[in-house]
Amino acid sequence: MGEFSKESCPSVKNILLLDSEGKRVAVKYFSDDWSSNASKLAFEKSVFTKTLKTNARSEAEITLFDGYIVVYKFVQDLHFFVTAGDDENELIIANVLQGFSDSVGLLLRGDVEKRTALENLDLILLCIDEIVDGGIILETDANTIAGKVATNAVDGSAPFSEQTISQALATAREHLARSLLK
């Protein structure tokens, strides 16, 4: 067998979820390209400003920005971004973005807006962790991602995507009861 090389795997530099004003909802950086928090915030502000006037509501858009490929999509009042080096395959990065936005949609049960995202921030951060580890892309299928994240929050008797609302409410009641009994 040949040696595994991190350079041979598609990778991303960061995954950003910003609100409609460009403020952070959930972000994760996998690269030292932005060494300080100030440089990260400056990058987020500039990429948000550059993409603000585009119409990325129905489909993801791809742009080259400061030597990086940035794939982005807007859903309600949330702006999803995935950044990669300019040597990465745009279609793979677009698949990462699609997997991220779709899995967030599944986990938030279609209520993809800032308030709901902040209330379920733990699920969104777990979602990012299931998609990318150390910059290496692990998974892009939204159902698989949401299923893995949901197994941490759901009893696992049924796949997350197949649960009915009554099952979800029952599960939520169980978790609430358990937390109150602790």
Curated annotation (Swiss-Prot):
Keyword RNA-binding: no
Compartments where located: Cytoplasm; Golgi apparatus membrane; Cytoplasmic vesicle, COPI-coated vesicle membrane
Signal peptide residue numbers: none
Bilayer topology annotation: Peripheral membrane protein
Record carries keyword Membrane: yes
Any single Gene Ontology cellular-component annotation: COPI vesicle coat
UniProt GO BP: intra-Golgi vesicle-mediated transport; intracellular protein transport; retrograde vesicle-mediated transport, Golgi to endoplasmic reticulum
Keywords: Cytoplasm, Cytoplasmic vesicle, ER-Golgi transport, Golgi apparatus, Membrane, Protein transport, Transport
UniProt main location, coarse: cytoplasm
Domain of life of the organism encoding this protein: Eukaryota
Subunit description: Oligomeric complex that consists of at least the alpha, beta, beta', gamma, delta, epsilon and zeta subunits.
UniProt record similarity statement: Belongs to the adaptor complexes small subunit family.
PANTHER family cross-referenced by the UniProt entry: COATOMER SUBUNIT ZETA (PTHR11043:SF0), ZETA-COAT PROTEIN (PTHR11043)
Biological role stated in the UniProt entry: The coatomer is a cytosolic protein complex that binds to dilysine motifs and reversibly associates with Golgi non-clathrin-coated vesicles, which further mediate biosynthetic protein transport from the ER, via the Golgi up to the trans Golgi network. Coatomer complex is required for budding from Golgi membranes, and is essential for the retrograde Golgi-to-ER transport of dilysine-tagged proteins. The zeta subunit may be involved in regulating the coat assembly and, hence, the rate of biosynthetic protein transport due to its association-dissociation properties with the coatomer complex.
Protein name per its UniProtKB record: Coatomer subunit zeta-2
Gene (name only): COPZ2
